[in-house]
Amino acid sequence: MIKSYYLFFIILIFLIFINNFILCENNNNNKYNNNNNYPFINVDKIIYTNSSNSIYLVWSNEQFNLILQSSYNEEFDDIVMIGEYFDKIETTGWGELNITFNSNSATIQISDNEQAYFTGFIESVLTGERINQMYNNFAASEFTNSDHTPSPKLIDFLNTQMEFVRDQVFENNGSSQYWYSTGLIMSQFDGLVNGYQQSPFPQLSEIQLYILTSAGDLETLVTLFPSSSSSSSSTTNENKNKNIKISSIKPNFKDELTDCSGFIRILPDYSDVYFGHTTWRYYYALLRIYKFINLQFNFQDTPMEYKVSFSSSPGFISSKDDFYITGNKLAIMETTNNIYNESLYQYTIPQSVLVWQRAMIANMIATNSSDWVKIFSEFNSGTYQNQWMVFDYKLFIPNKQQSSSSLPPNTFWIAEQIPGQVKTADLTNILNEQGYWKSYNIPYFESIYNISGYSEKTDLPPSYQYSYEKCPRSLIFSRNASDVLNFEDMKSLMQFNNYKTDPLSYSSPLNSISSRGDLLTIENGNRSAVAFGGVDSKITSFNQVLTLSCTAISGPSTNGGTLPPFTWSQSPLFQNITHIGVPETFNFDWQEMGPYPN
């Protein structure tokens, strides 16, 4: 009897061990996103046949169904999410995407992760064809080997980074708002993947879609891990953290001027503050979607409303431009800086959070400017080095002569990132003193400027190109700032390119607020034309921020009609550039984005 008891006890212990082992394995699978953890969504296939759609995600017949609004049956369908996509890229240069959670859903409880997952799923179903076009354009230009695929080392870096993020979410999302929010961003990405893979369009893998949505970070990573050895020189440095070979890339066209122009203007009568951004990029990426997301989360029983509008592109969960307006009345943008000191890349490690993720996490959590830059600074990936600008419109009262007619402290913060460091500061006093803030791809902080290697570049011709105070855009912004007295003036400034007669442009279409690399000639730029330059402008103001709205234009600048519109057929140089789905000619007008419910 005793022996039988011991035998029973041993068998019981063994069964408990096996059960715990299985649970452990299941948990490990869960943290890496076993897709079975998300609800199945039945998609009405007719959605894929229309370029513009209004759809509902409904709970009916004991399952989630994605249907056209016209198919909605009030008696049987409980609306969970609303999605709208209007593809006007051929007529205005923009698609418009609006995804909203219905908090009044009556028959089923929706978790935060499901909300986020549904958001990504709906986006990829509505924009799947554009996502496929965007990825093919991106891969054809960014991956220079014969089959246009990323290098194995790049894939390894991103897989390791994604694993790190999912690990941290799994271990900390119950106690940390940061990792809870990160988990929601990753659930949105999972929805994007699953929604796209359920579509009839040519398949893209999870890592391909992760590469696409990480396009900003890849500006650094494709340099560190080139897909073709022909793009790198013979010198390399060792990354001490992961034994990564860093290619010493000779500065190419884009390295010289990087991305974007930003400008903030306080009107002299204190009636408004304009917040404007002009994106610079290669023209193959001129597939633009303005997005609005309206979700309602809870962290530890505390409401965490997530409302954000932003300029973006197909397959991007973030902006990448970057330009955001949040429900907390924050306006956020960035311009990109270079790294000329390659030793800094030892701090570019996969055990980190990518820039696109950190920006969206900060958008989700931050209620003021100082919080935004603080949250963004955590888990620095050392990729996509930017100057971030955050303006808190809650602290601006139009026409009210506040003490000394100035913005209060903490209204305007900036953050400048390099590998291994993010420097932040409240620069409201500078904005008050100047009446404006200018940003143009050169670090503001002297310490960041020096350690990045800019100071050594000033000895190279043209020396002005690397000077914070003397580069063309700095001088143009300072000269033209006082001319901005109304919204039309601001629109003109953000599209400004008068290179033919402006002495500050040195006769080059690159040297202005919205550059036109396609207008380069041997005479004016000592190089051939290239399909790169300013591709849009977005401007918001006090009243627009209240409804997460802005005014935007898509396409290379015509400077109010004095420059020819860009067209792909204007040069044989552009004919071999893959630009699927991109309009042939860009001659669009300004568009109103919003208002969106706030």
Swiss-Prot record:
Record keywords, A-Z: Glycoprotein, Hydrolase, Lipid degradation, Lipid metabolism, Secreted, Signal
Predominant subcellular localization, coarse grouping: secreted
EC number: 3.1.1.-
GO BP terms in the entry: phosphatidylethanolamine catabolic process; phosphatidylinositol catabolic process; phospholipid catabolic process
Position of the signal peptide: 1-24
Enzyme class at the top of the EC tree: hydrolase
Gene3D superfamilies per UniProt: 3.60.60.30
GO cellular component: extracellular region
Annotated GO MF terms: phospholipase activity
Record's subcellular location: Secreted
Residue positions with a glycan: N50, N98, N173, N341, N368, N450, N480, N526, N576
Cross-referenced PANTHER family: PHOSPHOLIPASE B-LIKE PROTEIN G, PHOSPHOLIPASE B-RELATED
Function: Probable phospholipase.
Name this polypeptide is given: Phospholipase B-like protein G
Gene from which the chain derives: plbG
